[in-house]
């Protein structure tokens, strides 16, 4: 006779997942202050919108949770994805990067480099990576954020 392994209730699993201590990336004191409903200091109004949407939808997340990734030539580095989210149904961690200055060519180059590193580490958009983006003329669309969260995190 087989024994069915116990599966933690979603609420307990999320509670334990959220309780993991970590040190995120520091934000310089002279930077503008943006705070989420949970009281986290984030880097932009758009990140407030994403964080508060995740919270409202009951999706557990960590802001700028450190992630060690391999670089070329046997090197590695610690990255701080904007959000590390937990899909409670699958128990998978999904990264969410928001690219908020896509009309700045230097920013775009750095974003492309980051995406290349993610892909080298097996983290692909639509699988373990959600990408949102905006420009000055095409700001963040809240409905799109909700749809992305629903599609990948529910």
Please describe what each predicted stretch is.
Residues 1-62:
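Solvent-exposed, charged helical/coil patches
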Residues 36-44, 104, 108, 135:
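Short, charged/polar micro-motifs that form catalytic or ligand-binding hotspots
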Residues 40-42, 55, 60-90:
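Active-site metal-binding core of divalent-cation-utilizing nuclease and nuclease-like domains
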Residues 45-49, 78, 113:
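Short, well-structured alpha-helical interface segments that form or flank functional binding sites
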Residues 68-78, 104-105, 135-140:
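Acidic-and-aromatic substrate-binding clefts and catalytic sites of carbohydrate-active enzymes
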Residues 80-113:
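Short beta-strand-loop-alpha-helix junction that forms the active-site gateway
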Residues 102, 106-125, 136:
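C-terminal structured domain segments
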Residues 119-154:
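Basic, glycine-rich
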């Amino acid at each position: 006779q087989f024994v069915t392994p116990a599966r933690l209730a979603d609420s307990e699993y999320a509670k334990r997942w959220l309780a993991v201590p970590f040190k995120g990336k520091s934000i310089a004191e002279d930077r503008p202050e943006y705070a989420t409903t949970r009281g986290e200091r984030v880097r932009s109004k758009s990140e407030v919108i994403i964080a508060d949407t995740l919270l409202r939808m009951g999706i557990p997340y960590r802001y700028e949770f450190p992630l060690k990734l391999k670089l070329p030539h046997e090197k590695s580095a610690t990255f701080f994805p904007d959000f590390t989210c937990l899909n409670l149904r699958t128990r998978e961690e999904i990264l969410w990067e928001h690219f908020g200055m896509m009309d700045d060519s230097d920013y775009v180059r750095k974003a492309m480099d980051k995406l290349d590193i993610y892909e080298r580490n097996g983290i692909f958009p639509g699988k373990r990576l959600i990408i949102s983006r905006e420009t000055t003329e095409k700001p963040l669309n809240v409905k799109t954020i909700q749809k992305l969260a629903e599609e990948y995190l529910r």
